[in-house]
Amino acid sequence: MVKVKFLGHAAFLIEGSKKILIDPFLSGNPKAAVKPEEVEADLILVTHAHGDHIGDAIEIARRSGAKIVAMYDIANYISQKASDVETIGMNYGPTTIDGVFIVQVPAWHSSSDGVHNIGNPCGYIVKLDGVTIYHAGDTFVFGDMALFNELYGPIDVALLPIGGHFTMGPREAAKAVELLKPRKVVPMHYNTWPPIAQDPEEFKRLVGDKAEVVILQPGEELEL
């Protein structure tokens, strides 16, 4: 069994034979379900360099011994800030790390420390214990999402932003569901702050019977 726990905003903890933490923005996150010191991980996947995604990755990696996986340039950026943390740089494509199959896939967004561009944004497809999970990162919908299902599907659960303003809104995310064809979908990256206020029930209505929409509150988990 694999558990997907929503930690708030775009942060998730995937628990199976390994613990995989994605975009651990916890400190300063008004929706965070846990504190950084309460999280253990084997791998930390970072989708891009914005502070609400890279978050507490370094602190958690230092304490838990987790490896940080990120776009090559972002991995180098992290290494410069924390030479004692093990990083693994990628540049889109598949790999296997500690027995976990990971595909770093494109995302339409930006990636910076707020001033300087750092690498490119991405999403991740993770296969753990026979379960396939897609975390989109911050992105708009794009046609090549259909390839993710074609190459690596079926996708058991897609974690999709619906907040609009910086990412897809409910309408665009519902279109992404059509392209990805996941069995289940969990909305994320909404209602953290006023600019990304959305009603997840509207997203659920737009998806209809194309997938099962599971609306998780921070701290809740989905068992697969």
From Swiss-Prot:
SUPFAM superfamilies: Metallo-hydrolase/oxidoreductase (SSF56281)
Membrane-crossing residue ranges in chain numbering: none
Keyword field: Hydrolase
Statement: the UniProt record of this protein carries the keyword Cell membrane: no
GO molecular function: hydrolase activity
InterPro entries on file: Metallo-B-lactamas, RibonucZ/Hydroxyglut_hydro, UPF0173, UPF0173_UPF0282_UlaG_hydrolase
Domain of life: Archaea
Protein family membership: Belongs to the UPF0173 family.
Classification via PANTHER family: UPF0173 METAL-DEPENDENT HYDROLASE MJ1163, UPF0173 METAL-DEPENDENT HYDROLASE MJ1163-RELATED
Protein name according to UniProt: UPF0173 metal-dependent hydrolase TK0141
